[in-house]
Amino acid sequence: MYDDWRVMFNMLEGMYHNHPVKIDIAGTVETIAEITAEKLYEVYNVFYNLNNMILCVAGNVTVDGVLKVADKMLKPCEKKEIKNYFETEPYEIKEPYVEQTFPVSMPLFNLGFKEKADKPLNEKQLACTDILLSALASNTSMLYRNLMDSNLINSSFSYELFEGPGYCSVIFGGESRAPKQAAEMIKQYISDIKKNGIDKEDFEIARKSVYGDSVSSLNSVSAISNSIIDYAMQGNEIFAYIDAVANAKLEDINSRLAEMLDVDNCTLSVVKQPDEV
């Protein structure tokens, strides 16, 4: 849905000063009109290059069989190294609040916490982050129950780690009749948890949940290949991540909590009806 898209990109525009992750890739009428055949070929030849690709095949195949097909179908190309260059991105957010009016049945919000992104997270950091977020905001968490009991969210509420080259953020969001109140409750809950640490029982529930989801995803051949690619692009390995989840300790999670979710470095994005206050 376009409104979901808009609330997220407004948040990214409020968080990031320079990083291109904030740019709406759908473009505008003006930018699309500027596209030429020469530009398309330039982009194609730079990025759709065998030296800039990873091939992953999952299923009832052999290495020799895959290589035979690849050698037949893939066009040889000039060997080149692709490097990305990004402007320096400060740690601090650009704007704490972004709002847009749009014809929606209920206001939407994204609360994004900007994280350090000097280098990609490794398997242990990813595992600890996923367990931490599950303990904080899954539908079995105290935060989720408090938000629901206060009628500040509904079942659309979600959370995610949004990470890539040069950017990293944690996002909470969904539909809310009072987005600012929901955001304040989330920030206050995080502040309280930072003082006391994650409860051991909550940690165990979250660790088992993340581990179970990770293992069950291996039932899907397409999920396996997608996961291998996703992790490989960041220099990681899916099975090392699963092992890290299985071996995670409570102190690892609390250590990760201390490193992230700075309540003074977050952006609230809201999309609401024009006549709503």
Predicted features, each with a name:
Residues M1-I82, E99, C128, T140, ...:
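Charge-rich, well-structured scaffold segments of protease-associated domains
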Residues E13, I82-M142, N146:
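His/Glu-based metal-binding/catalytic segments typifying zinc-dependent metallopeptidases
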